[in-house]
Amino acid sequence: MEQTLFNPSISMPKSFYHKHITISSRIQCQLSTNSPSSNTKTTTVTVPSKKTMGPYTGRDPNVKKPEWLRQRAPQGERFQEVKHSLSSLKLNTVCEEAQCPNIGECWNGGGDGIATATIMLLGDTCTRGCRFCAVKTSRNPSPPDPLEPQNTALAIASWGVDYIVLTSVDRDDLPDGGSGHFSETVQAMKKLKPEIMVECLTSDFRGDLEAVETLVHSGLDVFAHNIETVKRLQRIVRDPRAGYEQSLSVLKHAKHSKEGMITKSSIMLGLGETDDELKEAMADLRAIDVDILTLGQYLQPTPLHLTVKEYVTPEKFAFWKEYGESIGFRYVASGPMVRSSYRAGELFVKTMVKERSSNSAAKP
């Protein structure tokens, strides 16, 4: 799942506060418009208690957000066009829901003009509770909408994007983890708009390799699954049902299930990982022939989520990009604001162009 960012100016659904705040201490503040009377307005403000933070959550006063993480408001002609289309089509995008800092770059198409967006399938409620993510959770979320695959395809076919990323919450309540629903959506899209490039950013399907195969053979162009963090921090960062080896097995099986399948993964930095641990994780991904890697800064959604241990500098991100490509990744997107689906269309096209150039040079 992609990391979601929290914007305090956005009104969050009641279920979010119920999930994240009811376990904390309550402070009652009485706000009166006039002198105390029967018409006095009372507002209950709920704040996190230090007792409920846990050993890995809360904010570290010694770690200050640097200037390089500040972004200008998104703008541009293509951005406005896509935004208007989204509104009329009523599509649920991770770009907007997660307040992604790269929304302007992706929707405008960056330097290559390839507009990219990320659509969330299977609802907005996850069956897991990873400590970095602000998506609401439930053991029994609402059943998937059976019309969603076709409706999504119809909407996307009429929308001016060249590259679409399909992702979803984890659905451990479904027998196949939602793989069949994903597959139906991809097939419907390709039928209506064959030229569109489709990337699927998936869950681990509980390690069900048959579910992985179902999706791999649906017609998608890129299979993405995130290991999220280094091996040592897995149990701290991710839900216990996720796992480092399980994620690697999913990526490995996707690569081996179909010749030429492009695979992709992502790692968040700033969670306390060491350079050697990150090198180990990158080596493990290359050992199973993962093609594309994205590296970005972890940003804490709320004080109840994992503490940011470090803000990695842009220079260090540049080093990791160079290092990653030196050990064999076909493309590495590395930067403080990079996220899993960051300008995904550009990454895919650059990878393909680089591959074609190499093949041409190799021919006699």
Curated annotation (Swiss-Prot):
[4Fe-4S] cluster 1 binds at C95, C100, C106, S341. [4Fe-4S] cluster 2 binds at C126, C130, C133. It is an enzyme of class 2 (transferase). The keyword Iron applies. InterPro entries: Aldolase_TIM (IPR013785), Elp3/MiaA/NifB-like_rSAM (IPR006638), LIAS_N (IPR031691), Lipoyl_synth (IPR003698), Lipoyl_synth_chlpt (IPR027526), rSAM (IPR007197). Pathway: Protein modification; protein lipoylation via endogenous pathway; protein N(6)-(lipoyl)lysine from octanoyl-[acyl-carrier-protein]: step 2/2. Residues 32-52 have a biased composition (Low complexity). It comes from Ricinus communis. It comes from the Eukaryota. Belongs to the radical SAM superfamily. Lipoyl synthase family. Residues 32-64 are annotated as: Disordered. One of its GO terms (molecular function) is 4 iron, 4 sulfur cluster binding. Coiled coil: none annotated. Residues 1-70 form a transit peptide. GO terms for biological process: lipoate biosynthetic process. Residues 109-330 form the Radical SAM core domain. It is found in: Plastid, Chloroplast. This is Lipoyl synthase, chloroplastic. Keywords: 4Fe-4S, Chloroplast, Iron, Iron-sulfur, Metal-binding, Plastid, S-adenosyl-L-methionine, Transferase, Transit peptide. It catalyses: [[Fe-S] cluster scaffold protein carrying a second [4Fe-4S](2+) cluster] + N(6)-octanoyl-L-lysyl-[protein] + 2 oxidized [2Fe-2S]-[ferredoxin] + 2 S-adenosyl-L-methionine + 4 H(+) = [[Fe-S] cluster scaffold protein] + N(6)-[(R)-dihydrolipoyl]-L-lysyl-[protein] + 4 Fe(3+) + 2 hydrogen sulfide + 2 5'-deoxyadenosine + 2 L-methionine + 2 reduced [2Fe-2S]-[ferredoxin]. Its main location: plastid. The keyword Iron-sulfur applies. Its EC number is 2.8.1.8.
